[in-house]
């Protein structure tokens, strides 16, 4: 038996054991095609986010012992200790790759966890237009930005659709002829380009900043980072600005312009002064995603053209009249 076959069989067994440990309400929710995320709270309530609907509460609850068993089983599967001195478990579930976050006391009052399903049906930019989440003019402008190797920053709140939109951009044919290197904490991005390398951080040994630096030795044409959260932001900006344009990354922010200020804050984890000019030169386009209930849409897109000493010089990627959409039904 080859090592690869043995690994796949082990993953299959782990997946079966884990899903057996889930109570029926969690199993049914994960099996439902319209489920986006399942959340088990410390009080035992179970909340489910459904596509096009939003978050609803289940009529079923989970006992603390059941919630803790799930968390411990996930921790065991990734060979991590869990308990009062290590109460947080972050993992990718075996099999279908759901993103798992579990917490135990003392950081939570009782065991709780969240399971986010990966997108099973990839969306393309045209799908956003069809569902009223993106105007045709803005869609064309974003396609042109990707084609001309603009560096694109996608911002938004939690669960606003940043990853799904990144995947839609990566599905564009313009990426097919390039060598793409994708860096992530959890494997969520998909790129059909034939010359694609996907790398993932490893807790305690390999951080995102190290991966960005290592990537430069892999001869990338485009560098894609799932989400910047810290000092790696500075390394990525330098990479994009020194011969590796055409990248995409995401971060949490409350507006398109606010994403540039948030980027400043992240770079300050690696330097004493925010690199305003570097940010203005490296970031070409900022896309802001929003969510209201179960609806996600592209709320705003800016073109960045410089820094005037006090603020970033920006303008709408397309005129406001052309960027408006009548409805946002993107999930």
Name each model-derived stretch.
Residues 22-28, 74-93, 178, 270-276:
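Active-site phosphate-binding and catalytic loops of NTP-dependent enzymes
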Residues 159:
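Walker A (P-loop) phosphate-binding loop of P-loop NTPases
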Residues 154-156:
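Hydrophobic anchor at the beta1->P-loop junction of P-loop NTPases
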Residues 1-57:
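N-terminal anchoring/assembly modules that precede and organize ATP-driven motor systems
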Residues 49, 55-148:
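P-loop NTP-binding catalytic core
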Residues 162:
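Conserved lysine of the Walker
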Residues 149-152, 168-282, 288-291:
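Switch/coupling sub-region of P-loop NTPases
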Residues 280-331:
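Conserved P-loop NTPase
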């Amino acid at each position: 038996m080859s090592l690869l076959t043995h690994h796949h069989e082990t993953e299959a067994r782990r997946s079966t054991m884990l899903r057996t440990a889930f109570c029926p309400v969690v199993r049914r929710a994960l099996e439902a095609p319209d489920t986006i995320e399942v959340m088990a709270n410390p009080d035992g309530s179970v909340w489910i986010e459904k596509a096009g609907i939003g978050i609803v509460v289940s009529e079923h609850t989970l006992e603390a012992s059941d919630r803790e068993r799930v968390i411990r089983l996930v921790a065991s599967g990734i060979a991590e200790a869990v308990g009062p001195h290590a109460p947080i478990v972050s993992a990718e579930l075996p099999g279908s790759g759901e993103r798992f976050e579990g917490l135990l006391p003392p950081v939570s009052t009782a065991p709780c966890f969240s399971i986010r399903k990966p997108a099973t049906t990839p969306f393309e930019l045209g799908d956003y237009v069809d569902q009223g989440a993106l105007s045709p003019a803005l869609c064309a402008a974003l396609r042109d930005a990707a084609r001309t190797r603009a560096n694109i920053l996608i911002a938004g709140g939690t669960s606003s659709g940043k990853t799904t939109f990144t995947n839609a951009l990566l599905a564009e044919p313009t990426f097919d002829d390039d060598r793409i290197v994708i860096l992530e904490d959890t494997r969520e991005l998909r790129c059909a380009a034939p010359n694609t390398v996907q790398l993932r951080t490893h807790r305690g040994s390999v951080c995102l900043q190290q991966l960005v630096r290592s990537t430069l030795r892999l001869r990338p044409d485009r560098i894609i980072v799932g989400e910047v959260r810290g000092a790696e932001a500075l390394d990525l900006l330098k990479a994009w600005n020194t011969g590796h344009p055409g990248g995409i990354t995401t971060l949490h922010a409350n507006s398109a312009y606010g994403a540039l200020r948030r980027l400043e804050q992240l770079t300050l984890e690696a330097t004493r002064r925010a690199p305003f000019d570097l940010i203005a030169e490296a970031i070409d386009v900022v896309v802001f995603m929003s969510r209201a209930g179960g609806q996600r849409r592209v709320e705003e897109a800016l073109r960045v053209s410089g820094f005037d000493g006090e603020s970033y010089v920006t303008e709408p990627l397309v005129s406001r009249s052309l960027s408006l959409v009548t409805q946002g039904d993107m999930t």
